[in-house]
Amino acid sequence: MSDLSVEMPKLEINNPGDFPSPLISYIKNDPTFKELLDSNNYKELYSYVSNSSTVTGQLTHLLYSLGFDPLKELTFVPRNFLSSQHYPPTYVTIPDNIEYLDVNSFAISDLTTISLPANLRYIDRFAFYYTPHLQSIEFRGTKEQWKKVRKIPDWISGASITNVKNIICKDGKVKL
């Protein structure tokens, strides 16, 4: 296992037909996007594309394909981070520096298992919206710490709530 937070198949960058067209349009035509990509300022880069869920998810896929781990440089999981990515990252480990999950962080993805840090403070709405393959949410803190995490209504919703019944904490389970 690598030390990247998200494991997913690599994009075949040498084959233009396999490269996602919405993202390639940003790369080719948007000087601000290119400048932010070159700067490795992940906070600004994700903020810049946050209104396009497809591009945001494709950006995440590109960065991990190139061996970059943006989550290690941020304190939050960006909006639409894995959105519309149907390459099953079966297990995602959110690094300890992450304090909150933004809107739609993992929405509409093939995520199956996620491990959340003990210092997580906030989960925004639809963070786990329509993740039909999600089977397990692990929290690396205690049940008491989990209860203190501020969770906006509908933080887990759609097909996600069908499979996940409990949060697995280090000292036991908490029912959803």
Could you tell me what each predicted segment is?
Residues 150-153:
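A structural signal for leucine-rich repeat
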Residues 1-18, 25-76, 85-100, 109-122, ...:
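Structural signature of tandem-repeat unit edges
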